[in-house]
């Protein structure tokens, strides 16, 4: 028995001794290989990579089949002659600066990839197209700072479908941070019921995005989500959203009207800062707090409607004239419409007393009178300017045949 055990150990010794850990080139691709763990990671190559690179799902080294599981830090960075890369479904991570400043033109990222390291695709200004398997996997990927390839890509494909008008289906509950960061091919996004949250920077600088429609299942949106979406002109917020966070819609310079639903009780710092074309704002009745410079530098502002019986307060303990929510928006030339019994409260509040004209909401605006659909006398529009056959629940724009226009809230 003892002799048999010694013989078994002797057989195992050469195998252990031959285990390899280090860098080696196989079929033109450099890898970090660990034969003991039977895995390999694509690594940087002297002089960089050229042309089309198809990464295999596995390689053989020293008689061991090793699965290719990752693209290491800086692997393809500064590869000035690189064109296309196909990544196998065995790869789960793409490392920090993996493709940074390369001349990559197209890349396929499989659903197996769970993370993109910081600056993974930074400076890839030759990138034409990105292709992924499905939205479910793409919306769940963890994307580091300045790592999203879509900020450079002209085309984004889910399967064989190019995405310009995006629908986030009910099968996706969370859209992770930076998922569509900087994608200039995106023109509209609609969220179906079932989506609950949108991460920070998710649609940051999508400069051609014109329309955003949120389902009422969304209860959280992060910071800087729609920052500098400079073409955004149609916005429908979730009726279950409790707050709008810091810089969420900052520099959405085309947005002209805004309806803040009753569910929202707080608006964060610079949430709508520099929305330079914003003319009309309607705040629901539950708003309690507005942050620093939330609506600053909105120089076209003419009318603000607040349905809160108690005037919302400034979100910070200390303030100066330049940090108040409407600083730089010339509120002294705008009209604030508030509940009649609350006028004195608003006049005493530093957030609101800066308005040059504070008036009572009319009965129609308060929804006391019913709006009748008489097509020969009135035209009814939604807040985003679409015509409606009848007044709908919530806010309506009603234009009478005599030229008078008013905003009406229907309960």
Predicted ranges, named:
Residues 1-3, 395-411:
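C-terminal tail/sorting-segment detector
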Residues 35, 48-70, 80-93, 101-115, ...:
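Structural signature of tandem-repeat unit edges
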Residues 361-384:
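Residue-level detector of functionally pivotal "anchor" positions at catalytic/ligand-binding pockets or at interdomain
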Residues 61, 382-402:
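Short, surface-exposed loop/turn motifs with a glycine/proline- and acidic-biased composition
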Residues 298, 318-332:
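Short, conserved loop/helix-junction motifs that constitute active-site signature segments
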Residues 14-16:
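N-terminal signal peptide c-region/cleavage motif recognized by signal peptidases
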Residues 72-75, 95-98, 117-120, 145, ...:
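Consensus positions within tandem repeat domains that build extended binding/scaffold surfaces
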Residues 19-21:
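Boundary of Sec targeting at the N-terminus
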């Amino acid at each position: 028995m003892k002799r048999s055990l010694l013989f078994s150990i002797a057989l195992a010794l050469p195998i252990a001794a031959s285990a390899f850990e280090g860098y080696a080139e196989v079929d033109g691709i450099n890898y970090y290989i660990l034969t003991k763990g039977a895995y390999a990671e694509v690594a940087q190559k002297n002089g960089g990579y050229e042309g089309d690179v198809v990464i295999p799902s596995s390689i053989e080294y020293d008689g061991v089949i090793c699965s290719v599981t990752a693209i290491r830090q800086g692997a393809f960075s500064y590869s000035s002659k690189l064109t296309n890369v196909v990544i196998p479904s065995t790869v789960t991570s793409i490392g920090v600066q993996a493709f940074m400043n390369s001349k990559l033109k197209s890349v396929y990222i499989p659903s197996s990839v769970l993370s993109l390291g910081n600056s993974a695709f930074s400076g890839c200004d030759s990138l034409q197209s990105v292709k992924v398997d499905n939205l479910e996997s793409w919306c769940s990927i963890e994307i580091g700072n300045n790592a999203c390839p879509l900020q450079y890509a002209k085309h984004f494909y889910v399967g064989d479908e190019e995405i310009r008008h995006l629908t986030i289906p009910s099968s996706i509950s969370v859209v992770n941070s930076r998922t569509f960061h900087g994608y200039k091919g995106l023109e509209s996004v609609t969220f179906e019921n079932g989506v609950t949250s949108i991460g920070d920077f998710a649609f940051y600088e999508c400069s051609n995005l014109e329309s955003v429609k949120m389902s009422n299942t969304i209860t959280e949106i992060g910071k800087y989500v729609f920052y500098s979406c400079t073409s955004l002109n149609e916005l429908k917020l979730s009726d279950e959203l409790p707050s709008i966070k810091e810089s969420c819609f900052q520099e959405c310079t085309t947005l002209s009207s805004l309806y803040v639903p009753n569910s929202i009780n707080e608006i964060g710092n610079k949430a709508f800062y520099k929305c330079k074309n914003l003319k009309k704002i309607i705040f629901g009745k539950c708003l309690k707090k507005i942050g620093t410079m939330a609506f600053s530098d909105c120089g076209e502002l003419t009318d603000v409607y607040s349905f809160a019986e108690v005037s919302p307060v400034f979100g910070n303990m200390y303030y100066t004239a330049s940090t108040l929510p409407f600083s730089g928006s010339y509120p002294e030339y705008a009209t604030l419409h508030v509940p009649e019994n609350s006028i004195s409260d608003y006049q005493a509040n530093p957030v609101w007393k800066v308005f040059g004209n504070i008036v009572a909401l009319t009965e129609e605006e308060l929804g006391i009178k019913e709006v009748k659909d008489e097509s020969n006398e009135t035209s009814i529009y939604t807040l985003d300017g679409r015509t409606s056959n009848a007044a709908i629940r919530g806010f309506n724009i009603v234009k009478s045949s005599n030229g008078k226009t008013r905003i009406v809230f229907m309960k």
